[in-house]
Amino acid sequence: MYVIAGLGNPGREYEGTRHNVGFMVIDELAKKLGMNVTKLKFKSLVGEGNFKGEKIILLKPQTFVNSSGEALYDAVNFYKIPLENVIVIYDDKDLDVGKIRIRKKGSSGGHNGMNSIIYLLNSEEFPRVRIGIGKPQKDLVSHVLGKFEESEKKLIDEAVIKAADAVIDIIENGIEHAMSKFNG
């Protein structure tokens, strides 16, 4: 069983913003896996299904990014998921737009949503897929809550598909394989 959480902010006003790239990947995964992420549970929109004999739980926390740990903590404890089967997908301002990075574990890198998750799970030992949103030209809040520039949209669309494929590869072949295949 896997719990896969994409970080983002709820509400129409945040759709398409840099901070919501995790939600975009969950939507792409749901499409690829034939799932609907519409049930409200664990302070999240949830989709449940099966893939290659594994139960898959997709989460879009509705707590706002900075409190994402609350939603993930509830789901992980309910399902008794080992942390190596918890995959978190989120935006990273330190990666160029459209780049993805997969890691087995690590710090928050200053991402407040990840700070919340690490604090509440009491561990940094879970896989994550980071999607580059580029360095802010202005203040950080305006950057992460801003929409992608027209010139960035193709890169992000491709990165969302690639990140979804990377998550599927983690499930099918393990994180080491996915890291060697998708980390550029």
UniProtKB/Swiss-Prot annotation:
It is an enzyme of class 3 (hydrolase). One of its GO terms (biological process) is rescue of stalled ribosome. Transmembrane segments: none annotated. GO terms for molecular function: peptidyl-tRNA hydrolase activity; tRNA binding. The active site is at 19 (proton acceptor). Gene3D superfamilies: Peptidyl-tRNA hydrolase (3.40.50.1470). The record marks 91 as: Stabilizes the basic form of H active site to accept a proton. It catalyses: an N-acyl-L-alpha-aminoacyl-tRNA + H2O = an N-acyl-L-amino acid + a tRNA + H(+). It is found in: Cytoplasm. Pfam families: Pept_tRNA_hydro. GO terms for cellular component: cytoplasm. Keywords: Cytoplasm, Hydrolase, RNA-binding, tRNA-binding. The record marks 9 as: Discriminates between blocked and unblocked aminoacyl-tRNA. Its EC number is 3.1.1.29. TRNA binds at residues 14, 64, 66, 112. Monomer. Belongs to the PTH family. Hydrolyzes ribosome-free peptidyl-tRNAs (with 1 or more amino acids incorporated), which drop off the ribosome during protein synthesis, or as a result of ribosome stalling. This is Peptidyl-tRNA hydrolase. It comes from Thermoanaerobacter pseudethanolicus (strain ATCC 33223 / 39E) (Clostridium thermohydrosulfuricum).
